[in-house]
Every structure is written in C-alpha cells, then in structure tokens.
C-alpha cells in the first residue's frame, strides 16, 4: 500500500522539526533550498556528512531556484552514496525525487520522497535507537504515517538489499561469528513467541467462556414466558436474540478453528524450540571448548612473554657488566688526568707567586713612563704649534713679497702710461679747453669751450666715469671677501695641521710603546722572570681554567662512581641460581607454538633496553670530551640496530596476523561443517503436511538471509 506523498511530507516535516537545526524547516518552501536537510544529515551521521561537505552547500540561495536545485542535487547524491556504501541499501529509481520540481515549485510529493530517503538513513545508521525513540515521542497519527513510510521503504528495498550478489563477498570468519550470535537470539524470540501465543490462547478461552455464559442466559430468558408486553415485541426480541445467537455461534466456530490452528502452530514452535535448544547446547559445548583452548593459548602466551622478559633481563645484566668494566677503566683514566691537573695547578701557583713580587716595581716604572710620555707630548704639541706659526708667517711673507712685486710692476706700468699721457697731452689740449668737465682744475669760465663738443661724446665720457666708479667699488668688495676667505682658509689649515700633528704624535707614541713592550719582554725573558701585567693576567686565566677543569673532573668522577654503584650486580647466591634456572627454562621454550610472538616481544624489549642504556651515557658525555667520539659511534650503531629490530618486528607481526586469520577461518569453517552435518542428521524422515513443508522452506531461506542482513548491519564489530 503506497503512502500519500503530500500527507507523508507533512508528517515528515513534523519529524524533521525535532532535530532543532539552525535553518527553518516548518514548510516545504523552507526545505526547497536543501540547507535544512543538509543540517539534519549532519546530525544523523557527522562522520559521512561532515563539516567540509556542509560547507559545499550554498547557505543563502535566495529566489534563485537554480542554486536550490544544485544544493538538492548534492544532498541527493550524498544520500544515495551513503545508502549504497555505508548502509548497503541501494535506492531504486521510483524512490528518487525530482529535485528540479522541489527547487522551483516546492512540490510536496517529491519533497516527501526526499524526506523518506532521509528517514531511511536515520533508522539504519549507528544512532538508529535514538532516532526511533524520537519518532515514538511524536503524535500517534504522525507515528502511523512515519511507520507506513518506513514499511514501504523496507519492503521495496528488501529484494535488492538481500540479493546474493550484495553479500557474496563477506568473509567466512565474520559470517560464522554473527551466525553463532544469531542462534541464541532466535531461540529467545521463539520462546517469547510461544509465551505470547499461550497468553492469547488463554484470553480466547476466557472470552469463549464469557460468551457461553451469555448464551446460556439468553436461552433462559427465551425459555421463560413473559407475562407483559405484546407478541410483536416478543417476536422482535426473539429474532434479535436468534441473530445474536447465530453470530455468537459463528464467532465460536471461528475461535475454535483459530484455536486449533494456534495449537498446531504452538506444537510446531515447541518442536522448533527443542531443536534450537539442542543446537544451542551443541554450540555451547563448542564455545566452552573454544574458551578452554583460548585460555590455554593465553597461558602459553604469558609464559612466552615471561621467558622473553627474563632473557632480556639477562642480556641487560651482561651488557651492564661490560659497561661497568668500561666505566672503571674510564675512572682510572680520569684519576690519572686529575693528578696531572693538580700538579700543573701547583706549578702555576708557584709561577704566580714569583710574578707577584715584581708587579709593584713594574707599576712604578709604568707610572714614570706615563708621566714622561705626557710631558713629551706637551712639548711636542708646543713645537708643532710654533712650527705651524712659522709656516704661516713664511706664507704671509711670500704673499707680501708677491704683492710688492705686483705693486712694483703696476707702478712701472702706471709710469709708462703717465709718460704716454704726458706725451699725448699736447694734442688734446684744445679738447680739454673746449670741454672743461674733463679737467677738474679748470674754472667755470674755461668750461664754455665744452659746449663745442658733441652731445654723444659727452654722454660716453659720463658713462665711462660711472662704470669706472662701480668697478672700483666692486673691486674693493671682492678684495674684502677674498681677505675673509683667506682667514677661513688659514683657520682650516691650522685645524688640519693640528689634527695631523696629533695623529703623528699618537702614531709615534704607539710605535714607542710597542718598542718599549718589546724591550721589556726581551729583558724579562733574559732575566727569566715574567713580571709583565699581561703575563700575570694570562697566568691567572690559565689557573682559573685549570681549577675549573679540575672541579669538573671531580664531579664527573663522582657521578661515574655513583653510576658504578647502581650497576653493581648483587652477589647473592640465590640470584645466581635463579639466573641458571631461568636459562634452563629458556632452552625448553624453543618448541613453543607462539615462537613468532616470543621473537616480537624479545625484539621490543631489546630495543627498550638499548634506549635505556643510551640515556645514562649521554649525560656524562658532557664532562668527558675525549670519549665523545666513541659515544657518538656507539649511538649510531645502536640506531642502526634499532632500525633492523623494528623491520624484523613488522615482518613477524604481519606473519603472526596472517597465521591468526588462517587459524580462525579454519576453526569457523569446521564449525559450519559440523553444524550443517548435524542439521542434515536431525532432518525428519517421515512425511510432513504441506503447511509444515512450506514453513520449513521459509525458515531455511530466512536463516541465511537474516544472517547476511546482520552481517551487513554490523560489518566492523570484530574491530
């Protein structure tokens, strides 16, 4: 019977609101974007519908129906993949909704199909009990519609989900494991079913008794004559009672036939219960035997582990004895080195005492040398100052001499010009008389002749006079500026010369100090004493370094002695006997069934001991630089050994896992064969009714299919 998709959409909307998603989901229009459905799927299975998948859904598509269709396609694709890959429930074509109608028109029928797929994922996931409890809290009408949708989905998915091709590749080991677990569950279900049928039979018998009593009462009433009432009313009552009697007789007959069927069914169920109990006893005995074998294997494994631990302890003790001998040798070397350092320290102290007696004399001589150097530097500065003044005076003298020569040359040129002018004075006399402005000594009466000169000549003469005055003023200003620059140049030269003098004096002083230092060193070497301050500082530094090394050597020696005391093996005779007994037990464990596991444990313990022996040798390596190279070499060798041990461990572990898988698979196959043989022996040889044959065929088909379904729902319980 198909469910109305519109009604289903409304009921599933009510169910969807119980998830409390951030997106609204009260109407089909709210679900047309696909965002609310995506949030619900994220709550159903966060591992599959994770946050990365949720971010791929567009959060606000708005009125754009194409974005809504894109979101719905992504949600539908993920739903189908989840059903096929995780739940192993392939979705048929008739259950796939048309997402374009949902995104564009919010079609309730197509939306109901989509929500029906979401419901199927919810009741088939790992949290299905929580979702079923959530459905039970809804209204009764909503529960009825939801249950019809689940039944429709399961009835249409059962043929596909229970096909042999889907479950043909399961491991026989897991199949046998779940088959054993289903046997006990089927026995409990059949027992509960028998109890329910007995309870129904009791209720039907009580109901039959009550109906018989009521029938007897009605017959008594019919037999009594009624004094009151009309005959028509009596006839009507009689007809009514007869009809009720016929109905009750029919109901009684139906109940009798149903009781007979239930009795037959109960007998068949009792036979099935007896068979299942017999099978349960056989399986219980097999389980007890398997548990006993498992306990024996655990004991053997513990003994092999104990043997490996004892062997590792023995190996570590031997290694520690070798290390103890090596540490004793190192302690002897450190003691010899410590004695050498102590002798060197005493020698340095004697040299320091001899050098202290000459330090005061050296300080007095150094102060005198510094005073003499200061006086010499002052005198040198004065001499340089007078030398610079002398050079300046010489430069001034040279400049004055050059100026004198220039003035003499200018005087000669002026004399020649004056003579030439005197020679030519006779010719322009008339010009001078005509223009009295050219002759400053002429009287105003003589200037009357100047009017005879043309106007252009007079303007030219005036312009030349003004130009001459301007040039004279400019020459005076340039001369003042040149004098000022000359003064600045002299100041700069004086400062530069002073700096050069200071530099030269410093260089000379430095060379003198170096020469003095060399002389003093030579003198001290000749005298055989080391009284210089630098040498005393060097001796102090060397003494401090030797004292520090001596202190470090003492600390190192003390640490190694403590470590030797810790590594010192006990001399108890019982411990020696115990070690011999353990060695004897180790030789007896060579033929154990768990040899590979023992080898694995031994390698792990050896690697741990190597790491533990590396740590105490890394700490004293800081105080013993000569042994650093050997320790590093040992560390590299142990790293290589650890890598080899890890590779061997990986190989042994993989081989051990394969052996366990083969052993368990063979065990389960043997149990399956024994059970099949027992079922064939218990099969009834006499003829059965048609109904019994059909029930046996149904149960035989239901058993493997039910086990396959349980294997499908729980494929990872072993892990």
Curated annotation (Swiss-Prot):
Q: Where is this region: Disordered?
A: 696-719
Give positions of region: Sufficient for interaction with CNTRL: 584-719
The UniProt entry's coiled-coil ranges are 180-427, 455-607
Instruction: Read off the SUPFAM superfamilies from this record.
Output: Hook domain (SSF116907)
Region annotated Required for localization to the centrosome and induction of aggresome formation, chain positions: 1-161, 533-719
Which biological processes are named by the entry's GO terms?
cytoplasmic microtubule organization; cytoskeleton-dependent intracellular transport; early endosome to late endosome transport; endocytosis; endosome organization; endosome to lysosome transport; lysosome organization; protein localization to perinuclear region of cytoplasm
Query: Which of the residues bear the PTM Phosphoserine?
Result: 163, 710
Give the similarity note: Belongs to the hook family.
Write down what this protein is called: Protein Hook homolog 2
What gene name is given for the protein in this entry?
A: HOOK2
